[in-house]
Regions:
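Hydrophobic N-terminal alpha-helices or hydrophobic patches in metabolic proteins across all domains
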Residues: 1-207
Length: 207
């Protein structure tokens, strides 16, 4: 699924990685898109903001893969530029997603984990989301990244989720029972976003 080597990973670590991948996927495909849709709507661009966000995320993944290609590697400068642009574009959506998780989960624990542990992740934007998720659910996230599987003829591939530099975040050991809690957290956040969109639409119509 994620092209990583999980052959010698304990069960709890596999559960942890599934939670991390799933939460980040929900952000990149749903909540980040909604955030940029709202930004685009406020700027009078309609749904262009949502399209812009998805294209930016895709471009970053594309150039990251091209950088590792053995036959036609891309320019390292271009890859760095795409990564830096993505960090800027994803800065606000990552924090709106983390705030949404905090509102529908354990607010104080999520904010505390956000403030104290987000910086321990190599990717600060992903770190904000994962730290807030860990606090909102009371589950232990973060730790060593899985080793990616390189395609034939390609060099090492960067990990999809950056690991924590040191110990894991505090919380319960990840279990399969946490999957239903993650699903509930995501659905409650979707409902929160829908409510926000309804309020924005009413404000626009009545204003």
């Amino acid at each position: 699924w994620q092209q990583v080597d999980a052959s010698s990973v304990p069960r709890s670590e596999i559960v942890r990685h599934v939670i991390e991948y799933s939460v980040l996927a929900a952000h990149r495909h749903v909540f980040g898109v909604l955030a940029w849709f709202c930004i685009g709507a406020l700027l009078g661009l309609g749904p262009a903001g949502a399209v812009f966000f998805r294209n930016a995320e895709y471009a970053t993944r594309y150039w990251r893969r091209k950088e590792q290609a053995a036959d036609q590697p891309s320019s390292p400068a271009l890859c760095r530029a795409a990564e830096q642009a993505w960090q800027l574009i994803n800065w606000l959506p990552a924090r709106t997603t983390a705030l949404g998780f905090a509102i529908v989960g354990s607010f104080e624990d999520a904010i505390d984990a956000w403030r104290n542990h987000a910086a321990r992740f190599a990717d600060r934007n992903d770190g904000v989301i994962l730290a807030a998720t860990a606090g909102a659910l009371g589950v232990r996230l973060g730790g060593t990244s899985l080793r990616p599987l390189a395609p034939d003829g390609a060099g090492p591939v960067p990990a999809a989720v950056a690991g924590v530099a040191g110990d894991s975040l505090p919380g319960e050991v990840p279990r399969t029972a946490h999957f239903s809690q993650v699903v509930g957290l995501v659905w409650r956040t979707v409902a929160l976003w829908l409510l926000l969109l309804v309020l924005l639409t009413l404000a626009h119509v009545l204003g």
